[in-house]
Swiss-Prot record:
Transmembrane segments: none annotated. The keyword Glycosyltransferase applies. This is Lipid-A-disaccharide synthase. It comes from Magnetococcus marinus (strain ATCC BAA-1437 / JCM 17883 / MC-1). One of its GO terms (biological process) is lipid A biosynthetic process. It catalyses: a lipid X + a UDP-2-N,3-O-bis[(3R)-3-hydroxyacyl]-alpha-D-glucosamine = a lipid A disaccharide + UDP + H(+). Pathway: Bacterial outer membrane biogenesis; LPS lipid A biosynthesis.
């Protein structure tokens, strides 16, 4: 009997842990004696990961936060590198977390260890020239969006679109009528969902704007209902400390948990730019997208970011499916007008739903998904031969 396959893995976000677990679970069916060590979250640990650090320790956003945690991050990096040297794996799989992951991949490549990265850095949004540098660190790249592999076409890197995992996850637990009954909204009434973001900075910049938009809509259409979908990452205190006192009497229902249930019950959505726009697209909910950041950040971003669009549905379709309102244009007057258009013009809303359905179809995993691509890579490029 030959030796078991040995894989080192790095993941640092909850979403990355989910992706890694799905991939490793599939690989274990093909290589049942597989051994894994590295950095991961609870799902990876359940699959037998010999964990050297918790993924949460690498889930840091912001320059100041990274600087504060840098000694610990460096310790984790050096410990994993030392183990790669003492117990060389058959391959290293890194998932998202590009700053940490790609540095580790570069070191692994220097050690002669084959490298696989899951989730392409956003070279399509800014610094597309990075693609060549990224390619020099990797042997295989797994992409979530169908337009991403072409950015690596002239780099020599094998890049594959493998489908987006949210397609399988974006399934409501309730029917539209069941969700409306829970919310106390009649079948005849119209419901507008509000998703102001999953980060505290987004809540601080967008919540009041979104609530004042709802206020303007309600004054024009008193039969409207509103449901604000509170992200799991936002506490009640964080939400209500920026909720203006003057707007506490608005008929806005606040709900936590499965966003898909409340989206499926809604007729339109006002949403902060981010993953939530993709979740809404997969449900097929007509939406207006808002984006606000620090003015200096925006000016810098304008110089770096080359994409015409900010929302994922538009980026994937490469056309203006949904309305995007940025910075000063993301104001209650404009946003309420955009939403009224969606609510008053069912044919336009239906056309948007159809365009979003096409977006969803484009994200379905191909027959040769992540597990198949990596398995082929292990057998044909790494040269591993199962021993039984």
């Amino acid at each position: 009997m030959g030796r078991p396959l040995r894989i080192a893995i790095v993941t640092g976000e909850a979403s990355g842990d989910l992706l890694a677990a799905s991939l490793v679970s599939g690989l274990k069916k093909r290589f049942p004696r597989m051994q894994i060590y590295g950095i991961g979250g609870p799902r990876m640990k359940m699959l037998g990961l010999d964990s050297m650090a918790d993924a949460q320790e690498l889930s840091i956003i912001g320059v100041v936060e990274v600087l504060n945690r840098f000694p610990r991050i460096r310790t984790i990096f050096n410990a994993l590198l030392k183990r790669l040297q003492s117990e060389p794996p058959d391959l290293l799989i890194t998932v998202d977390l590009p700053d940490f992951s790609l540095r580790m991949a570069r070191k692994a490549k220097q050690l002669g260890i084959p490298t696989v990265h899951y989730v392409s850095p956003q070279v399509w949004a800014w610094r597309s020239g990075r693609a060549k540098t990224i390619a020099s660190y990797l042997d295989l790249l797994l992409c979530l969006f169908p337009f991403e592999p072409r950015y690596y076409a002239n780099t020599g890197l094998e890049a594959h679109f493998v489908g987006h995992p949210l397609v399988q996850e974006a399934v409501p637990s309730y029917s539209r009528s069941e969700a409306r009954k829970i919310l106390g909204v009649s079948e005849a009434g119209q419901l507008v969902a509000i998703m102001p973001g999953s980060r505290r900075s987004e809540i601080q910049r967008l919540l009041e704007t979104f609530l004042r938009t709802a206020e303007r809509l309600w004054k024009r259409r008193t039969n409207l209902s509103f449901v604000l979908i509170q992200a799991e990452t936002i506490s009640d205190q964080q939400l209500y400390e920026v909720w203006p006192e003057a707007l506490r009497d608005l008929p806005v229902i606040v709900r936590h948990g499965n966003a898909y249930n409340w989206l499926a019950a809604s007729d339109a959505l006002l949403v902060a730019s981010g993953t939530a726009t993709l979740e809404a697209a997969l449900i097929g909910i007509p939406m207006v997208v808002a984006y606000k950041v620090n003015p200096l950040t925006y000016q810098i971003g304008k110089q770096l970011i080359k994409s015409k669009f900010i929302s994922l549905p538009n980026l994937i379709a490469q056309s203006a499916i949904v309305e995007e309102r940025i910075q000063q244009d993301a104001n209650p007057e404009q946003l309420s007008e955009d939403l009224i258009q969606l609510l008053n013009r069912p044919q336009e809303a239906m056309a948007m739903r159809e365009a979003l359905r096409v977006v969803k179809q484009s994200l379905l995993p191909p027959t040769h998904g992540a597990v198949e691509v990596v398995s082929d890579f292990i057998l044909h490029k790494v040269g591993y031969r199962p021993g039984g």
